[in-house]
Amino acid sequence: GFFYVAWVIRKLALAEKIHPAAAVSAVPVAVVTGSHEQYAVIMTLLLVLSGVYLWKAHRRPGNAVLFWTLAVIDVVSLLVIALCPGNAGRNAVSIADLPVYATFGFGQKLYLGLLSIERVFIANADIVFFLVVLIWTWLVWEKTKDYRRTFPSALPLLILFGQTVLRTAYPGLSGLFVMPGEILEWSWSDLSTWIPMVYLAVTVAAMIYALYQLFGDDLFTFISVLLLVGCGFGAGMVLGFMATIYVSGERVYAPLYGILLAAL
């Protein structure tokens, strides 16, 4: 559903003609897709960026009625989600099972959210993330033909390879690679607390660098892709502010999967 709605919004932004059947089917698909809070936020960003793009190009969307229909669906979806107690209910149940979570402050919850991205999505050598970074690195090389400009784009791959080999060769070091769903307390002075954050910082910096090499010639496109990828990472990071992080697994990274694949 996300890919279909994104495809329709893209055609609207490019003022391309949309088949009547595609336009009609986009409405129920947008309703279903927008019922998920993370996808609703991403739809909002896509519509806003499309509106800015159309405004900059001084033209109307390919189908103005469909564009505004999708916008109304998105706004209504966000309002319904904001008034829906579903997430609050699930969070309350999780806190009842893990009362220690209620004692966590802002910094601890932020750390859990960042850790969940680095440990669950990246450090597990997720195939989507691996392929995306591999293709980005190859595209940077194809564009620049300069290994010195390509090497920084490959840093996430080197990190993945290095720590995977390390964990496989030395199981005793597994304590340095904890998963957020396996810890209820940690010490800010421990090395294992900060290694994932360093990996995450280097990975994000390398991804931004790769995107700049690929899209830096068009500032609007670069910022748009950067915002979308950031929105995907944020969808995973915000989970740290809910006790459901201990039971959600990789389900919450579906939006980031979609964004990374769409960016290709």
Residue positions per predicted region:
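Carbohydrate-recognition beta-sandwich/jelly-roll modules
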Residues: 1, 31-33, 57
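Short hydrophobic alpha-helices at membrane interfaces in multi-pass membrane enzymes
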Residues: 9-30, 65-68
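Transmembrane catalytic cores of multi-pass membrane glycosyltransferases
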Residues: 37-45, 52-215, 221-226, 232-252
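C-terminal amphipathic "assembly/sorting" segment characterized by alternating charged
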Residues: 247-264
